Amino acid sequence: MMFGNGNGNGNGNGSEGPGESETGRLEAFSDGVLAVIITIMAFELKAPAGHDFSSLRERIPALLVYILSFTFVGIYWNNHHHLLRAARRVTAGVMWANLHLLFWLSLIPVLTEWIGEHYRDSVPTATYGLACLGSAVAFTILVRAIISADGSASLVATAIGRDAKGRASLVTYAVATGLAWVTPWISYALFVAVAVMWFVPDRRLSRP
């Protein structure tokens, strides 16, 4: 889900309400974890062994996987930011759902390195697909936890509705994971397709 955020906090005096303070702390914690995840991925990039183009060419698959993973994490950071800006309450369920999402995202750096070195093999590709699927499921759980906390008439609940794009992502990741055992290249194409789909702006939670 790609959400928009507003400028005001709804209390008219510019001060921060209790709910916004809670969601702000949760967002700050999550931002820190996501920053570490991206940093680890960058540290795991290896320079070409030689000084010619053939050495660089050998590292292109790993670089492409890094770009895909960076985009993947970046999309979740963007969506997570807008989702928490729209949320009003942070319950224990929301906190655990948020940690569940961060768990799956924390697997991305090690899987990025693995698949970058073995991009032709089914097991690393399928495992990467499982991490993508797990992250998508975890984000859906987080959304539902926020709706449960804020109520069925909340902004998040009203705006998201049946969430066709989210459901399509879950199905695509599941298919990509299964097809990794046939040919990893189809899986990569599906991973990219999901990323492209989420690049299209979705302003369901935009505020004036």
Stretches with model-predicted labels:
Residues M2-G8, G12-P208:
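Multi-pass alpha-helical transmembrane bundle typical of ion/small-solute transporters
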